[in-house]
Amino acid sequence: MAIIIIDSQVHIWGAETPTKPYFTENASKPHRPIPLGHKELLQVMDANGVQRTVCVPPTWEGFSNEESLVAARLYPDRFAVMGRLAIDKPESRELLPKWKTQPGMLGVRTAFHQGRAPLWLEDGTADWFWDAAERHGVPVMAFAPEAVPKLGEIAERHPGLRLIIDHMGLSSALRGKPLDGAVENLLKLARLKNVAVKVSALPCYVDEPYPFPTLHPLIRRVVEAFEPRRCFWGTDLSHLTSSYKQCLTLFTEELHFLSDNDKEWILGRGIAEWLDWPLPQQA
């Protein structure tokens, strides 16, 4: 049986308009001047044998998930969404109980790396969110490269919360620098069975050509600690510094310590089960 490949993160977004300006507060700048839409993404996926993608609305679109939800409605067998939620807004508390009733919505993706957002992990702003996500069974992806230990504390306090650490807990500031310290912080969370990790966008964190040999032992340590069922491949296409194909063949061809069964879990089955997005043969 062929492996179903799922990209665990791609940002898609629309053009900026006078009535829909990009956000600048607690947000990154667009990764490229021309928006990446679902039609282009489908072409890239088809060219590389990737069946599905988890669409993650980017921070510069604020808290609009519409572009991604439209893609999921048009192609429900190809796209699903981990949407953004304004954790600091009181009105968001009313949204989470019915969050997954939106067609194509699987959970929430949070980012704590820009503006005031990192403070929300420490000042109590985000406390309600972890409680509610656990209570309502909403999986969470979290990008907080400077606060991975804090995410571990949160996961330990909320054992029913399904938490995914984005991009192996790495920061763009580490590109070309030793990554061992950041990986060590991540490995301490492996004992928490409600924590998984996206082994995604990894070429972005090294300053060397394919096949990115510096990454191989680090990926091995993460996979051995979390086990393949809790490691999810992904590209972060719009931010990717390598080709899409290279990001994929890094796992399919270059990591010789991975068995075929390991690849099945890492490349798609793991995230499908974690996010309750049934694979075709399971539907």
Region locations from a protein language model:
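Active-site gating/metal-coordination segments in enzymes
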Residues: 52, 61-146, 153-155, 198-202, ...
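Conserved, mostly hydrophobic/aromatic
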Residues: 9, 45, 68, 108, ...
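Catalytic pocket-lining loop regions of alpha/beta-barrel enzymes
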Residues: 119-233, 279-281
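Active-site gating loops and adjacent loop-to-helix segments of metal-dependent hydrolytic enzymes
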Residues: 13-39, 44-51, 102-111, 161-162, ...
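Short hydrophobic/aromatic-enriched beta-strand-loop microsegments
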Residues: 79-82, 162-168, 252, 283
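Catalytic metal-binding/acid-base residues of hydrolase active sites
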Residues: 11, 59, 113, 169, ...
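Mid-to-C-terminal alpha-helical segments outside catalytic/metal-binding sites
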Residues: 3-8, 24-52, 221, 226-232, ...
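Histidine-centered catalytic micro-motifs
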Residues: 5-15, 165-168
